[in-house]
Structures are given as structure tokens and as C-alpha cells.
Amino acid sequence: MPLRPHIGLGFPAHAYQKRHVEPHDRSTGYQPKVRITDRYRIIGFISSGTYGRVYKAVGRNGKPVGEFAIKKFKPDKEGEQISYTGISQSAIREMSLCSELHHINVIRLCEIVLEDKCIFMVFEYAEHDLLQIIHHHTQQPRHPIPPATIKSIMFQLLNGCQYLHINWVLHRDLKPANIMVTSSGEVKIGDLGLARRFDKPLHSLFSGDKVVVTIWYRAPELILGSYHYTPAIDMWAVGCIFAELLSLRPIFKGEEAKMDSKKTVPFRRNQMQKIIEIMGVPTKDKWPLLSTMPEYNQLNTLANSMASSHHNHHSHHHPHHHHGHYGSRNPPPPGGSNLEKWYYSTINHTSAPGGTPPLASLGSEGYKLLAGLLEYDPSKRLTAAQALQSPFFSTGDRVSANCFEGCKNEYPCRRVSQDDNDIRTSSLPGTKRSGLPDDSLIRPAKRQKE
């Protein structure tokens, strides 16, 4: 039976927002002769990945109105021979889900064009993403993201997650690079290539697409081999993103373990170690189902080796405390956590001696929200709906729908290359462009006037 996009997913009516439908939005049925370049003028090339390439475009003669990001899926390629074997699972999932999802905090799919066996997905354009914004703040002089901006980003991100989860959709790959921000400060969850429905039984993360996703944002239950997905995996990632907005670096920066020849997934020992260094060793008291995890024995081995190396270190050195800005290299005592220490050393950090720490106003409510999102036991971890009710958002400054409101920072625009802006004839991507954040940035002053 041929694969068919999962259209008409029967989402609850309350989940839809009323939205203004432009005349060009109204479906006129399948139009095989509409060419992508008849509808859009390509401004330039943005980036490429395993799926294909992304271009920036505007509507021809101002219709459709606005700027767009066009994602071109490449056909399957065997050697130099292009074989039209169909569409990847990832592309079908992204198309079917995006066609159904309509929310201010989820990137909007405007249309899908099929031309010469290539698929073009046309999305609304976002000038920034969180990776780019975080990177901008790490440039000298290093300066924290303003508290009001962090609050607004977190509220909008949680709002988008709540909408996905109400509609039985797991994103599964939330990370700063996939969280888009428009020039008007609207936060939009993007890249639903790994997203999937969870209202029916699922296979393990690795039994479908063998995709390597960044493991820094991966929930502990997945590292410990859980076969069951819940929206809690997305909430752990949101907690990691919150921590990164505060400290401007990934909180759990582990190393990717290599798959073996049998395509089995090794235990991500190093990633688990990074989590334990800040969160402590998980215990059955706090996480009753812990002992049912497939990698439970591996966890015990890791915890024992960390404890013995910590003991050896202290038997040869005078006891001393690490009050480093980014948490301790030593594991906390059994059942204990360094997260509170990590949080307060981060928000109370100031570059100017005697100055007021810029993030101090986030206070204890920020810690409670972070700790609730980074809860080991997925059944106790905050849901998006619970997190939105956090006093973190109702105390202090009003949360703005524009995360740049009152912001003095001018963020660089997304870099658009003119070298390869022929969307129809461009070669298929041979190599992925460098993933460094500054690869897609240019200073505002150098921005080309359109």
C-alpha cells in the first residue's frame, strides 16, 4: 500500500485559532502547471541539510504578500544516478503535520508545490532563530539576554508546545536552531521533520528513521533506553533551552556516541554523565520506574565510577568547593543536585564589579520553573500547560508577545547567499554547510537592500 500523507487528523476544534485566509490561501485544487518560479522570486540561498536546500523568496508582484522560506526536498540519489523512489518518511511527516497545524507559535506552512518530481514546501519566513540570538550575546563584550526577552521567548515557546501536545504531536527535536523568531519578536517552533503523532502506539526513536539528533537536549528516559514517548521528552528539551538562554551555553554538553555496525544505539554514557554532574544521580525514590529502564545497569556502573573518582580526588586533595559560574565538575551527593547552585551562580553573575547582575530579577520563580522542566521522572516533569501557569510569568514585568520589546540589541539578519539562488537547477547538496551559528549571520550594517 503506497504511503499517503496523514491528512485529516481529527484535531479537537478548540485547538484551531481563527486565522485570516488570504485569497491565495484558498485551495483551488491540484495545479500541476504552477511552477515555483512563477509564484515566487528567489532572493537567495539560506542553508542545506540532508533533506535538500532552503531558499529565501518573495511573492511575484507582491502576491503572495511577505517573505518566505522555501524548502526544496531532493529526490533520492544512488551514486550519480537520481532514482525517484518516493518521498522520505521525514518529508511526509512534516508535510502532513504542518498542513494541519495553525498556531501563532508554530511556523506556518503556506503551500506545497510539486514540480519535476521535486517537492517545495513554502513556509513563512523568520529572520532569526534562538541559536543565532544566543550566539550574538556570546560575542565580546559578552552580555546576557535581557530578562524580559527570556520571559517572552519561554512563554511563546511553551505556548507552541502546549498547542502541539494538545493535538497529540511530539516535536522530538527541540533545540535553539529549530526555534525561529520573526523580526517582530514572534517565537515559532520550526522543523517538524522528526515530529510525530503520539495517539497511537509508537516504535522506539531509532526503529524508524535512523536520524542522529543533537543529544544535548535529549531527555534522560531516552538516554536510559525507554521505548515510550510522552510529551515530557519535549519539556526536558525546553528546560535545556531555558538554561541555555540564561547561561549562553548548552547546560548538558555531552559527546555523541558512535553507532556500531549493527546500527544499535550505544548507551550515551558521556551525555548521562554531564546531566548527573548538575542534576545528581537519579534514584528509585524520586523516579519509581527507573529500575525498569533498559540501561539501568549502565547507569549504576556510571554512577559508581563517578563516585569513586570523586572519592579518589578528595583523598589526595584538600576538600575544596567549586563555585565556578557553570556548576561543578564533581557529582553532587546521592539524591542531591547542583542545579540550584548552577542557577543562582548564573543569574547572579555580573561582568561589572559592584554592578547589579542583569538576570537577578528572574529570582526564585525562574529556578522553580527550570527545576520543574528538568525533573528526572517524566511523569512528574512539568507539562507545557502547567509551566505556562508558573508564577515566573505572572510576577515582575508583564510578558510581551514581542520578545524584542524594549530591547536595545540589534540582532544580525539571516545570511542569504547570492551564489546559488537558482532553485530549479541548483545541484543537490553534496556537503552540509558548516553548522556554526555565525555561518548564517551577517551584521545589520552589511545587509543588502532589497
Curated annotation (Swiss-Prot):
Complexes and interactors: Component of the SRB8-11 complex, a regulatory module of the Mediator complex. Interacts with SSN8/FCC1.
A Pfam family it matches: Pkinase
Keyword Methyltransferase tagged: no
EC number(s) recorded for this UniProt protein: 2.7.11.22, 2.7.11.23
Keyword Oxidoreductase: no
Location(s) in or outside the cell: Nucleus
Catalytic residues (positions): 173
Compositionally biased spans, kind Basic residues: 310-326
Gene3D superfamilies, per the entry: Phosphorylase Kinase, domain 1, Transferase(Phosphotransferase) domain 1
Family membership: Belongs to the protein kinase superfamily. CMGC Ser/Thr protein kinase family. CDC2/CDKX subfamily.
Organism: Gibberella moniliformis
Protein name: Serine/threonine-protein kinase SSN3
Region Disordered, annotated ranges: 307-341, 418-450
Domain Protein kinase span(s) in chain numbering: 40-393
Lineage: Eukaryota, Fungi, Dikarya, Ascomycota, Pezizomycotina
Source species, domain of life: Eukaryota
Cofactor or coenzyme needed: Mg(2+)
